[in-house]
Design a protein with these regions (language model features):
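Non-catalytic, conformational "gating/processing" segments within enzyme and secreted inhibitor domains
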Residues: 125-126, 175-210
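Non-catalytic accessory/assembly modules
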Residues: 119-123, 139-147, 198, 205
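Short pre-active-site segment immediately N-terminal to the catalytic Zn-binding motif
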Residues: 38-46
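Active-site SXXK
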Residues: 47-61
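Acidic/histidine-enriched alpha-helical segments
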Residues: 115-133, 199, 218-232
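Bacterial peptidoglycan biogenesis and beta-lactam-recognition machinery
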Residues: 58-62, 112-119, 199-201, 211-217
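Non-catalytic beta-strand/loop surface segments
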Residues: 1-39, 65-98, 135-189, 213-258
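M16/insulysin-pitrilysin zinc metalloprotease superfamily fold
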Residues: 60-63, 94-125, 259
Length: 263
């Protein structure tokens, strides 16, 4: 059965896009902030910075101590997390609808007041390196995924994994992180999505209160290299110690906005 959503949209003067869906079936909400940046926006030398930065977003701001963001959400009956993809980075809180303002306040705060320090970078760098070892270097499925994408794409940024290459994770600098923050973590590069037990007009007022004063940034006019048209089969064989063979096959298809994609 198809789920029908009655979506309402509001645009702040600073470019922030707000999407709402009102649903009073339970006294809970899901609050999400999606930034239009992922590993696709990286370049050789700083691959993995989008995912590394996701980790650093939990390490405190001018007004919130390290890890306090998650503690405050949990103390008020909620959960929070984040994820990075090739195209987007998202942060979310699921919590009682009475605590909507808390989630809005915390997310707005770290959009503009994040504290980036050498100690934080050093700490999270090691966490991400260990994550990479676990999910890719010591994982057959991880090796297969890396081999698949690096073979299917030779020019487009999809060719590297979201977590990045280990050599780049090792050398990403604090200045790289600060430049990344200034460039992408800005209201005119973000979409706020709020679902659940809300009053749309009151919700707009709360979002305007905390996000409305944040100044937009001038977004870079990025040119993503286009992949050459593939005219024949590409193949990569990986030889590893395993009990049975693994196989992965990928096909290039048009982008999601193409008329050839059924909707």
């Amino acid at each position: 059965e198809q789920i029908k959503l009655d979506l309402k949209e509001h645009r702040l003067k600073n470019g922030l896009r707000l999407i709402m869906n009102e649903d009073h079936s339970s006294p809970i909400i899901s609050f999400q902030v999606w930034y239009d940046v992922g590993s696709m926006n990286e370049r050789p030398g700083i691959t993995g910075i989008s995912h590394l930065f996701e980790h650093m977003m939990f390490k405190g701001s001018k007004n919130v101590e390290p890890e306090e963001h998650s503690r405050m959400i949990q103390q008020n009956g909620g959960t929070d997390n984040a994820f990075t993809t090739k195209d987007m980075t998202a942060y979310f809180e699921n919590l009682p609808s009475s605590q909507l303002e808390l989630a809005v306040k915390l997310e707005a705060d770290r959009m503009v007041h994040l504290q980036l320090t050498a100690d934080t970078l050093s700490s999270e760098r090691e966490v991400v390196k260990e994550e990479r070892r676990l999910r890719y270097d010591n994982s057959l499925s991880g090796k297969l995924s890396e081999g698949l994408y690096s073979t299917a794409f030779t020019r487009h940024p999809y060719r590297w994994p979201v977590i990045g290459w280990m050599s780049d994770i090792d050398t990403i600098s604090l200045e790289d992180c600060k430049a990344f923050y200034r460039s992408y973590y800005t209201p005119n590069n973000a979409t706020v999505i709020i679902l659940g037990d809300i009053d749309p007009q009151k919700t707009i007022s709360i979002v305007e209160k905390y996000f409305g004063h944040i100044q937009p940034a001038e977004l870079m006019d990025e040119v993503i290299p286009e992949e050459d048209i593939q005219k024949q089969e590409k193949r990569k064989d990986l030889y590893v110690d395993t009990q049975f063979p693994w196989l992965a096959i990928a096909y290039h298809i048009p982008e999601a906005a193409s008329d050839d994609i059924p909707v």
